[in-house]
């Protein structure tokens, strides 16, 4: 059962609560063709007053007795059964113009609760049985969850099915090395769209994470490509550090560009660079100008004050070797490469940054 196919208006588990009331509850079914030739679109509704529960999905024809596509395509009365491990829906009504509707009666499977109990689950009551039937909780599924060691309750079996957790997904996750996950963990990681490949890549990268840590990475857009790029660039980071990088916009392209320029700033520096708009190109050009050994604070200070790499390179070409602080101070006072060139050409050489700044401040041009 795919969770995208299930619409729950007041919550799947609330459906059981609605049925549990002593008041009369309406139960109706509707049917039409599906886009798949071996399925029909089957809707089951249960309602009372303003409370409304609806099950809505494409269902294999094999789940029905006494129903065929030919029956659906011909007008007339409808009598068929929807049969699953937890029980049956006895449906009656009418078909017309390839659509059908009517009412149903739920008939529980009396042996199903006992079989669940043998596996260690709480025996469901009739209302729970109806909900288990609608979410297709089979004995095979219950047995697989039990054998996987998830320690699930009867209600959690239903939650697993609602959110699309399959036995194949559980097996794939456990093969990837996550044998500590329990039923709630599987529901949570499935809600956040964590694929088995991502879990496997985390393990291969040496990360042994809890479900919540995995989810935190996923929420902030960390994918396998980003993890691999970090690893290839030589970064061994904690999940919290990786998350922080993503939060501040450090992406795979940024990491790859740094690597292509032969640069590997510290992880904390990466965050500051992103915050202040320091690009890999800016770092490379500083390095090419002879400023490859600057600290993160020195680099960000240059960027904050608008010191361009062109000015840095031109100053070097003119024979100046200013400190990062000098470059910032000169830029603040409006000193550009043209001013430095005019000083040199006028014979004023071997001046330090403070002297040049004072000349500029006093209007010597």
Per-region residue spans from a language model:
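Bacterial N-terminal signal peptides
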Residues: 10-17
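General marker for long, soluble alpha-helical cores
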Residues: 2-5, 18-365
């Amino acid at each position: 059962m795919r969770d995208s196919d299930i619409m729950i208006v007041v919550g799947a588990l609330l459906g059981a609560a609605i049925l549990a009331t002593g008041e009369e509850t309406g139960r109706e079914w509707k049917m039409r063709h599906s886009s798949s030739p071996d399925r029909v679109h089957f809707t089951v509704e249960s309602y009372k007053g303003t409370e409304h529960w609806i099950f809505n999905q494409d269902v294999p024809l094999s789940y029905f007795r006494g129903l065929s596509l030919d029956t659906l395509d011909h007008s007339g009365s409808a009598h068929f059964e929807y049969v699953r491990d937890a029980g049956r829906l006895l449906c009656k009504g009418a078909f017309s113009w390839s659509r059908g509707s009517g009412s149903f009666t739920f008939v529980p499977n009396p042996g199903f609760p006992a079989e669940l109990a043998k596996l260690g689950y709480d025996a469901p009551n009739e209302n729970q049985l109806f909900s288990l039937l609608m979410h297709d909780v089979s004995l095979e599924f219950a047995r697989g969850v039990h054998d996987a060691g998830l320690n699930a309750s009867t209600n959690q079996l239903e939650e697993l099915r609602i959110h699309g957790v399959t036995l194949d997904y559980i097996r794939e996750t456990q093969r990837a090395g996550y044998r500590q996950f329990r039923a709630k963990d599987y529901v949570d990681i499935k809600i956040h769209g964590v694929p088995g490949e991502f879990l496997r890549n985390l393990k291969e990268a040496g990360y042994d994470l809890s479900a919540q840590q995995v989810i935190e990475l996923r929420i902030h857009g960390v994918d396998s490509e980003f993890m691999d790029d970090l690893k290839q660039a030589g970064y061994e980071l904690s999940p919290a550090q990786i998350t922080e990088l993503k939060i501040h916009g450090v992406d795979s392209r940024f990491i790859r560009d740094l690597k292509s320029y032969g640069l590997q700033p510290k992880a904390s520096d990466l965050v500051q660079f992103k915050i202040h708009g320091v690009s890999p190109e800016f770092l490379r050009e500083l390095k090419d100008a002879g400023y490859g050994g600057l600290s993160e604070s020195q680099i960000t200070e240059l960027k904050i004050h608008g010191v361009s790499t062109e000015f840095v390179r031109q100053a070097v070409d003119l024979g100046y070797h200013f400190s990062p602080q000098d470059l910032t101070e000169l830029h603040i006072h409006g000193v550009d490469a043209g001013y430095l060139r005019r000083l040199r050409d006028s014979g004023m050489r071997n001046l330090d940054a403070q002297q040049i700044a004072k000349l500029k401040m006093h209007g010597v041009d």
